[in-house]
Amino acid sequence: MKLGLALPPPQRDLRLDLFRGLANWAMFLGHVPGTVLVWCSFRNYGFSDGADLFVFISGYTSALVYTRKMERGFVFGTSRLFRRVWQIYTAHILLFLIYLAFVHFLSERFNAPDLVNLFNAGPVTSAPVEMMTQGLLLRYKPLNLDVLPLYVVLMGLFPPILWLMLRFPDAVMIGSVLLYLAARQFHWNLPSYPSGSWYFNPLAWQLLFVTGAWLALTGAGRLHFLLRSRFVLVVAIAYLIFGALMTLAAHQPQLRALFGPALFELFNPNDKTNLAPYRYLHLMVLIILGARFIPIDARGLQATIWRPLIKCGQQSLEVFCVGILLAFIGYFILQLAGNGILAQLLVGAAGIAIMTAVAYYRAWSKRVEKSSHESPVDGKRAPESTGSVEHLVLRGGGRVPQVARGTDSRQPPLTEV
């Protein structure tokens, strides 16, 4: 089976950065428990939330980035993927250590022992060596530190998946669906320590990641008719309204009465661990509507108001890690200084401002680093430097995979996380 990959004129899809930044902000706000900030996150208005969007976009962008690297051979592409896996893993371990240090220091310093148990940091006190070892193995995870281990696993398994997807995309997508169904049916999951299993079941959540990759490489072009269908539009909007009402019903008994106990219990509690089908469908509906009403060349994407979100999306690994720490610090400050509405809003605004500042700093730092690789004679970049990878459209004919090397000098290279 021969396939060819054709690229449109070079253009960075700012929608990916925008929504990835939005997912980061939403996850930060949703991780400050017991505050009005959680009502600014997605999870209270539908079945899916920022984590679903984050994993989907990560799969989409990973396919775009590493398809080009696979052009130079499977071994080279795999080595680049594993290098990125190592970067994500080390970021998680650094976050893991700093997070535990913050929790235990503030707990001791301000005589707040409940912090240790609330954020699942207590086991480190009783068995530090064992828990640190299990942390390195990604089996022990304090509260809110579940996303990056999931991403390490998904990226670590991506080389053979991408290689196969470039040749048999539909077969890989079908295999992903079958694995998802089997994991839910037979309760397959990875073990956690000291007990239980992973909060984000990789065997189920891989479906979102693979769906993103499949759409990036072939599915988006073939399913474009969904964006033009008025019937799909009506059904999508109806499902979003249903999802919002059903989710709000978990907090409002008056709404719960509209659905009845049997229907309500089908959707509550929301099965996030095993990626309930209604969560997956909810995100797909959001993606269809987003692609329909926000085209890739929408002029509004260049507006100044969206630049902080886009910048946070472009530097999402660093922003995500900082956001997790800020969520804990924000919660602690509110417990210490008062949990009034104004204080909560100030904590949320300060957290987003710091995350945005980190994103701009990292973007500036990367530009400085890249400029150091410029040739001192003619100002050209070193040969190993790569440009951006834009949206791919799968077509018949040709060989696997020849990807154009066009770049847009106005935008930074597309990154996978």
Model-inferred region functions:
Residues 1-395, 401-406, 410-417:
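Alpha-helical transmembrane segments and their immediate juxtamembrane cytosolic regions
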